Amino acid sequence: MSYYQIIVCILASISYIILLEVIALDLGVLDNIFIPKRFAASTDVAIQLPDRNVTLWSRQAVFGKHFTNASATTVINLYLPSNFQEDMSGCPNRNDTDASYFYENDIIDYDIEYIEQKSYSSKPSARVQKDDGGESKDEAILDFLLVQRGKCTYFDKALEAQRLGFKGVIVGDNRSPSSFRLHYMVAPDKVDESKVHIPSLFVSTSSYNLLWSDLLHSYRQPLKLYAKPEELGDMFWPFLLCFSPSIIMLITVQALAIRKFIRTYRTKSKTRRFIEDLPSRTISREGFYSEEEEIENSTQNGELVPLMDESTRRATFGVECVICLESFTKGDKVVALPCKHEFHRPCIAKWIVDYRHACPTCNTEVPPPKPF
């Protein structure tokens, strides 16, 4: 494995880890670890669609009433706004003179006395009417309004749904359907959160589209849902278990890559030291060796290196470096491998260390293997 392959492997591993973190954060799996203190009151709620046998995840707002009993299941009748074909934001009508509210810094501040009078009496035009034209008398069933994120604050949406008589509101995201991130709905600064008495739930774009589609095909009937408080953070261990095979494989590949890198480094270091310890010969005449050639470091491991006569040397080993294909000239320093083939020291050092641990002429292994 080359350095390039090792770097690519490490970069791919880092990218995979980042991808897992993005998926975990997008699903809210790590929210219970990194949750801010101001959001401690917010709890996730599982919404079940009995007709589809599907469970959707939602997140309660920091303000308003909360579902806290994890053992209790709340029945919800979900409605669309009366003007759902034009506006699904659920924001208050700024031209509505029936409500006594005013604007300050683009935040709506309602008259709390007016809200307390109107909070449990809905406008007939505000929701899809039931077949009998009356309101639900079952206290165990809560009427919720489905709206979409945008145009005003979450607090305004909840307050408007409360003013219309709904017992809760579900706010759908308006981002890409591929995003499953659940937002923490908070009230604006300097706003009295006690004005909202109803629960508010936030769902992803895909969940909102599913609810909206079912309501459109419900033939003017409310959509029945079941809500139960559950912690989405509890999905951390199932999430980890799901991806554990790929994580284990990633760790194994990383360990093998590191082991290969260490072994390659040690082998190259050993080979480099071996080449540096080889005896060096200096050419005294161009094209061949004379008997009077200067010998430097002509001993290896305490033993003398025998010289060969000129004719034998020329016939057997040639008069040029087979790596750079340049003839040996006077003053060149050459080294002889254990197989007696000679090369320029820089050429054979680069060849043996970086390319192949063998003689380029006869393929003899360099350094020679240790005897058993």
Swiss-Prot record:
It is a single-pass membrane protein. PANTHER family: RING ZINC FINGER-CONTAINING PROTEIN, SI:CH211-59O9.10. This is Uncharacterized RING finger protein C57A7.09. GO terms for cellular component: cytoplasm; fungal-type vacuole; Golgi apparatus; Golgi membrane; vacuolar membrane. InterPro entries: PA_dom_sf (IPR046450), PA_domain (IPR003137), RING_finger_E3_ligase (IPR051834), Znf_RING (IPR001841), Znf_RING/FYVE/PHD (IPR013083). It comes from Schizosaccharomyces pombe (strain 972 / ATCC 24843) (Fission yeast). Residues 1-24 form the signal peptide. SUPFAM superfamilies: PA domain, RING/U-box. The chain crosses the membrane at residues 236-256. A zinc finger (RING-type) spans 321-363. GO terms for molecular function: ubiquitin protein ligase activity; zinc ion binding. One of its GO terms (biological process) is ubiquitin-dependent protein catabolic process. It is found in: Golgi apparatus membrane; Vacuole membrane. The modification Phosphoserine is found at S280. Keywords: Golgi apparatus, Membrane, Metal-binding, Phosphoprotein, Signal, Transmembrane, Transmembrane helix, Vacuole, Zinc, Zinc-finger. The keyword Translocase does not apply. It comes from the Eukaryota. Residues 92-215 form the PA domain. The lineage of its organism: Eukaryota, Fungi, Dikarya, Ascomycota, Taphrinomycotina.
